[in-house]
Amino acid sequence: MKTISKFVFGRLLPVAILITAMSAQALVIVPTFDSSITSDPNAATIESTINTAIQFYETRFSDPITVTILFQEITTSGLYGHSSWWYYNISYSTYRADLQADATTANDTLALAHLPTGSANPVTGSNTVRVKTANLRAIGINGDNSGLAGGHDGIIGLHTSQLNLSRASINPGKGDLLATVEHEIDEVLGLSSWLDGGGGDPLPEDLFRYSSTGARTYTTSGDDAYFSLDGVTLIARFNQTAGSDYGDWWTAGAHTPQVQDANATNGSTPDPKNELIALDAIGYNLLPAPRPGISRITLNGTQLVLKGTNGLAGGTYLVLTSTNAATPLNQWTAVATNFVGTNGNFTITVPNAVNSTEAKRFFALELQ
């Protein structure tokens, strides 16, 4: 989903279209920071980045549930983050019926059209699926408490010394804390494959694991596995390399960095996209991104400065430009970008925005 605001800028007079709308949010994620984080000299930055990730999910999903997560630091070499979670076995027929009752989006409709009715799951043919505690509540099944320490739905470990703690300054040799937190939150909420557990009764995301020919696949052999709602549109490629999570995205060759990648790309700052579709499909209620408002536009020489509000916390916005408003948006040129913190306010500076040969130039603000 993309959120776009357009405005036109002439040489003399800037005109902005201000559109602000915010859907009511209901998902609540309650973090607990253990002493390894609170005693860290960079605790304030670490906690702020974690809270930015949490606010992102609370803004994008409307499920009226509370999810509790314990955050702690780890020192395992080569590992940026990990998560622990608790699941229960429930019947496939119950899970599918609850997905049907909870369906709210086009993703849900398409996914359900390709999940057969009946008692047998389409992956292994057994009558069972494994569903994590947060995911159970998202589809309306309450009372199944986590057996993790403190009763948390998840415990997330973060190797903060190997991560860029904020996006204000990027060390190209480190991973991204925000994306790492989002990766692990996705797994606490329900993403993962039970291929990591040796196979057997699947986790919900395994119901959407297809080969490139459109057949369901549930094997660690080969390198042909994709996340898809229908077996036709291949949304993301699953990792098939042993030693990395089979529920993560493929990184064995050239690829565009994503949050759920099996191996993070140092220096990159991916935001959740395909991961949101996956969470929507397994039972969460995805909301449109909030529409940002442009509160002020100023021109300093040829430099355009945009100030806005109501941006998506944890989101990255692009400024696109064209001299012809009728040009398809995918043909506009990206000229500036910025990351939005927890308060939703943002400032984006566009260099060389205008020149004396143009009567007008159009700009669009797009959520990356």
Predicted segments with their positions:
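N-terminal secretory signal peptides that target proteins for export/translocation
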Residues: M1-F9
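Residues embedded in well-ordered secondary-structure elements
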Residues: V15, E58, N145-G147, S268, ...
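Short, composition-biased motifs enriched in small/polar/acidic residues
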Residues: P288-Q368
